[in-house]
């Protein structure tokens, strides 16, 4: 039907006849000559209809926006002064000699333009229209380029692409599973995989040596801007490599990816930082290194002061007291500070103390703060020295349980960096290493795995049992501009160590056999040392395309309430289907107020 795509028409085709198919992007009638901007995936080309060709000219008078047409015509140079430097085809046009309307279109619900603001629910309801917009076409093209490059890189390095099952078994991995009832096995359920974690470990035991997969994963969890109930991972596993070797290979892949697709150079090697250092300096295990603000611990300076807001957390083994200097922040008004106080309150902070440094040379007289009267001069001077404060700066304080301080002050650091224009340009990758093996869950009163229960510890089995709270894991996360784009670890490859970890997590031998017996059995048959990681493909494309959400780089995403406006899913099923599956609903949701909530 066509000889070329619209975006491929250029000066190399001057004088040639071409056949084009696409959508009418814009139609203009200028003094008896009709101009149509014809659009397809590759771009736009201007098509001219003049009265010298009466049949196509007459038909062109009837075409409207988003009609699908086929044009045959001759490529010619645009008249001097009418060139469009913004188009690849901007120096030429096609003089139409034939026109066929392949399909008509109703008026679209919104313009097919990249810079038009449209309600997100409307965009998702008419996603097939939204995906026609040039910006969405560019994102899908970049996603294709990224996926193709990653596959080629891994193929070149001896990895096999192997598919793993979608219908699997429910296992505790930190989020709720999507369950699928089995018709052939009554009262039993499959689960959709949260990741191929166990299957890829079994592939290493199978001797596959190096595996990867571009795979859909499913998690039934509360959604945030960077989460979806179904998402895509680049899943990787390899045998006989330690963490340094895995990290070196993976950062080479990401470095080559940025060079190939964005013409951007990333550092070689990527910097590395321990989890403890990241939390100490940035109150985050995925710090954005483009923001030049750091937290400073001052608990030792607060020991013994009468100001209980600081003294209490300073004396608490689980507490933390920090200072965060904002250079030039002395110009913030009281209203600005009140707004920031409400912001940190979202994360559990009970307030936001501060000191303005109006004139460092004037001593205490040059400082402004309601908390100065509660602290001795030596403490104040110690804070000024440790934060290296200068005239015009503003120092914020966080004091509470370490978790609350980290969450609130870490978020404040990012907000101040963004609001004050402090975020540096460029790409700042980072490896975060030496994560704790476990964290204590107050609600359940037990240890939980910080990553997953198959991560290998750095210590011996005996040391792990003696002090699980101090054990570090062989885990590593790749962070880019404050977003975790990949995470992995060296895995446990001995049955005894795996059972020890299960014991510490409160998973007894009987429960472990019931849920993970297949893995424990496989570990007994010559399991090699192995490790790997998974990259969030959606997040990676989001960052590289400059999109604000992973929904912007997925063809058919769900809303933040896990609903698809396009096909109205999830939806009810009829009684016959439920009966066949042996399921009976206790209540009828239709009677109780409808089916799916809107966003």
Curated annotation (Swiss-Prot):
Organism of this sequence: Methylococcus capsulatus (strain ATCC 33009 / NCIMB 11132 / Bath)
Protein's UniProt name: Aspartate--tRNA(Asp/Asn) ligase
Residues where ATP binds: 219-221, 228, 484, 536-539
Pfam families given in the database record: GAD (PF02938), tRNA-synt_2 (PF00152), tRNA_anti-codon (PF01336)
Sequence positions that bind L-aspartate: 173, 219, 451, 491
Reactions accelerated catalytically: tRNA(Asx) + L-aspartate + ATP = L-aspartyl-tRNA(Asx) + AMP + diphosphate
Subcellular location as annotated: Cytoplasm
Region (Aspartate): 197-200
CDD domains in alphabetical order: AspRS_core, EcAspRS_like_N
Gene Ontology CC entries for this record: cytoplasm
């Amino acid at each position: 039907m066509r000889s070329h795509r619209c975006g491929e028409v250029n000066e190399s085709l001057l004088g040639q006849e071409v056949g084009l198919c696409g959508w009418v992007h814009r139609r203009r009638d200028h003094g008896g000559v009709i101009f149509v901007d014809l659009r397809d995936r590759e771009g736009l080309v201007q098509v001219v209809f003049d009265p010298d060709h009466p049949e196509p000219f007459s038909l062109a008078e009837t075409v409207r926006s988003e009609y699908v047409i086929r044009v045959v015509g001759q490529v010619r140079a645009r008249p001097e002064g009418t060139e469009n430097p913004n188009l690849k085809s901007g120096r030429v046009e096609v003089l139409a000699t034939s026109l066929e309307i392949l399909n008509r279109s109703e008026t679209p619900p919104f313009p097919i333009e990249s810079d038009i603001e449209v309600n997100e629910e409307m965009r998702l309801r008419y996603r097939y229209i939204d995906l026609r917009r040039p910006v969405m076409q560019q994102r899908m093209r970049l996603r294709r380029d990224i996926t193709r490059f990653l596959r080629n890189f891994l193929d070149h390095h001896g990895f096999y692409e192997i598919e793993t099952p979608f219908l699997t078994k429910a296992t505790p991995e930190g989020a709720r599973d999507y369950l699928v009832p089995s018709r052939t096995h009554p009262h039993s359920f499959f689960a959709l995989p949260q990741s191929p974690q166990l299957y890829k470990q079994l592939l290493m035991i199978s001797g596959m040596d190096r595996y990867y997969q571009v795979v859909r994963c499913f998690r039934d969890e509360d959604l945030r801007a960077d989460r979806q109930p179904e998402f895509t991972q680049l899943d990787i596993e390899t045998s006989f490599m330690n963490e340094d070797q895995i990290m070196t290979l993976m950062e080479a892949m990401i470095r080559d990816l940025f060079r190939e697709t964005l013409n951007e150079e990333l550092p070689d090697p990527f910097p590395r930082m321990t989890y403890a250092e990241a939390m100490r300096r940035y109150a985050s295990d995925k710090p954005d290194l483009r923001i030049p603000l750091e937290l400073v611990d001052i608990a030792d300076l607060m020991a013994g002061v009468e100001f209980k807001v600081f003294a209490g957390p300073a004396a608490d083994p689980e507490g933390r007291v920090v200072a965060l200097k904002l250079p030039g922040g002395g110009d913030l008004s009281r209203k600005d500070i009140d707004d920031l106080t409400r912001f940190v309150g979202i994360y559990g902070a009970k307030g936001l103390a501060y000191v303005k440094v109006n004139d460092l040379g004037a001593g205490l007289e040059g400082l402004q703060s309601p908390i100065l009267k509660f602290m001795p001069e030596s403490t104040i001077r110690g804070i000024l020295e440790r934060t290296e404060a200068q005239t015009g700066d503003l120092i914020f304080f966080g004091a509470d349980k370490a978790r609350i301080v980290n969450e609130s002050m870490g978020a404040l650091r990012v907000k101040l960096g963004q609001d004050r224009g402090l975020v540096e340009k460029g790409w700042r990758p980072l490896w975060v290493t030496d994560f704790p093996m476990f964290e204590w869950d107050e609600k359940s009163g037990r240890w939980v795995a910080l990553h997953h229960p198959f991560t290998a510890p750095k210590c011996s089995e005996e040391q792990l049992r003696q002090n699980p709270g101090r054990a570090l894991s062989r885990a590593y996360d790749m962070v880019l501009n404050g977003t975790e784009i990949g995470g992995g670890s060296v895995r446990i490859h001995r049955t005894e160590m795996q059972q020890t970890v299960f014991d510490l997590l409160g998973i007894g031998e009987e429960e472990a056999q019931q849920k993970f017996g297949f893995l424990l059995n496989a570990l007994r048959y010559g399991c090699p040392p192995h490790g790997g990681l998974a990259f969030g493909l959606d997040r990676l494309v989001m960052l590289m395309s400059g999109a604000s959400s992973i929904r912007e780089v997925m063809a058919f995403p769900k809303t933040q309430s896990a609903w698809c406006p396009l096909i109205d899913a999830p939806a009810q099923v009829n009684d016959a289907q439920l009966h066949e599956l042996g399921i009976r609903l206790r209540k009828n949701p239709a009677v109780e107020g409808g089916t799916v909530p809107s966003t």
